[in-house]
Amino acid sequence: MTANPYLRRLPRRRAVSFLLAPALAAATVAGASPAQAIAGAPVPPGGEPLYTEQDLAVNGREGFPNYRIPALTVTPDGDLLASYDGRPTGIDAPGPNSILQRRSTDGGRTWGEQQVVSAGQTTAPIKGFSDPSYLVDRETGTIFNFHVYSQRQGFAGSRPGTDPADPNVLHANVATSTDGGLTWSHRTITADITPDPGWRSRFAASGEGIQLRYGPHAGRLIQQYTIINAAGAFQAVSVYSDDHGRTWRAGEAVGVGMDENKTVELSDGRVLLNSRDSARSGYRKVAVSTDGGHSYGPVTIDRDLPDPTNNASIIRAFPDAPAGSARAKVLLFSNAASQTSRSQGTIRMSCDDGQTWPVSKVFQPGSMSYSTLTALPDGTYGLLYEPGTGIRYANFNLAWLGGICAPFTIPDVALEPGQQVTVPVAVTNQSGIAVPKPSLQLDASPDWQVQGSVEPLMPGRQAKGQVTITVPAGTTPGRYRVGATLRTSAGNASTTFTVTVGLLDQARMSIADVDSEETAREDGRASNVIDGNPSTFWHTEWSRADAPGYPHRISLDLGGTHTISGLQYTRRQNSANEQVADYEIYTSLNGTTWDGPVASGRFTTSLAPQRAVFPARDARYIRLVALSEQTGHKYAAVAELEVEGQR
């Protein structure tokens, strides 16, 4: 189940498995259409699962009350380097933070003493260094550690300028080592990577940069940055070097509402950008470059990668794989796979250059913020992450991840309580192995009836199946996220789909009336309450000093007359303010004459959807009148409104 409270959890989950239907398999496998060409299994099966972890830095020990922001890499000699912030005041830039480092010479089993790469200064004038990111030139052996240099301003407060002596500019620094990270030289590159004087702030995305292996830009070093442009928008930009780090330049800034972002080289030499979304969509943003990271195409939302607006990591599982090979398409991704909190630390695997992510496993179900991955010389992987108590290192292999390259889809579906629906299952076996007896396991409520079948999986081909779901008559209306796991002898793949029960289609709705909406200073459009995304919200007008206060109202046109029996309210997810308290609900057949209130009451501060129910009635319009706010504030904000009724 999802951790997003907007999607209801199915109570007391039961795992229901379905074996393939032999008759269906015999009838269809021979005619299965070819999938993406696969030359052998991209991920080798077998081996004993491995997952170990240990703390490298614990808050309050070894001189610093707080440690944050992990970076991880392997030196050309095979040593493992871990870098992170030591924060004497526990705050981000501007603060007297230091860039620290520990080294392992035995593949991460043991670690040397904590050392300083760039030392902050706690006495006036205060200076600090934060947010490390490693980048290794595999051709020369040079190691770079990019980080922030702050004096008086952090990312939000930095002003335009590039003078290294200006204390009100947040600067870009890079430390360089030619002896495997034992000693470092330092320089400020703010002017080098600021082609537009309107860029008033920048910082390197912590973790690890990349070096391209394929095509005309092979050897290029790329480190990702986030900048604030003249309009105040957060944009992503690749900073790169074609002369082994002697000089650095910035490519074209991309997107809006970006934040910490990473890149990975795809099997054909294109560069995939994967970004935190400061606009809070609840997912990762992605874009693709065809010119080695200088510029990027359109930015889109990857709805296979839920994210709570957090830093993440994306790498090639087999960094030395030949261009175009099956292994070159295998990517690993780590993040906090929740849309509402920094938790549920998860590693995912893609076998098709990030088009799908069928394999996932949780490594930290509790608190987990930033993380970074790197491939180790012995074929395992290093993971450095923030568990909430400092910096922790983990070592794992693909056998522990336990996946098979077989992405599958089950479409979202809507039905009424007491109804039954059958939906198709489509599986693409990207692996080079046959799976004669796959099974499908679904997380289902114990009172839901589910039946299904899946064909055998042939190498490089598509397979079909189906799932039939019967929802009891008394099921509470809502959107239910159902997890599905394809289980095979070679490993598992997973996906989710949404079963909508007893709710009208938001896509057919429109805003009939609203007392005010904030569009000048933020995206507080009223239409956000029917966009299906709880990360967006309607906000009443606030940018004018004389903006109206309570009561507030918003009315929906349902797109036709329906028999309805309730309204579901979801509060704004990322703020404790502007929460509706007392309310009234009205309905109308024509949008002019209103009946009611048909329901009234007081909402709580819960993040989950809250129901206001009333006797079933025919209506085309429904109105929420907000009478008060939970803490007495003047404004109102609503993430989503759903209408209970018959479609």
From Swiss-Prot:
Belongs to the glycosyl hydrolase 33 family. GO terms for cellular component: cytoplasm; extracellular region; intracellular membrane-bounded organelle; membrane. The active site is at D92, E260, Y370. Its EC number is 3.2.1.18. This is Sialidase. To release sialic acids for use as carbon and energy sources for this non-pathogenic bacterium while in pathogenic microorganisms, sialidases have been suggested to be pathogenic factors. It comes from Micromonospora viridifaciens. Pfam families: BNR_2, F5_F8_type_C, NPCBM_assoc. Induction: By N-acetylneuraminic acid, colominic acid, and sialic acid. The keyword Transmembrane helix does not apply. The lineage of its organism: Bacteria, Bacillati, Actinomycetota, Actinomycetes, Micromonosporales. Residues 1-37 form the signal peptide. GO terms for molecular function: exo-alpha-sialidase activity. The gene is nedA. PROSITE patterns: FA58C_3 (PS50022), TAT (PS51318). It catalyses: Hydrolysis of alpha-(2->3)-, alpha-(2->6)-, alpha-(2->8)- glycosidic linkages of terminal sialic acid residues in oligosaccharides, glycoproteins, glycolipids, colominic acid and synthetic substrates. Substrate binds at R68, R276. BNR repeats lie at residues 102-113, 175-186, 239-250, 287-298, 348-359. GO terms for biological process: ganglioside catabolic process; oligosaccharide catabolic process.
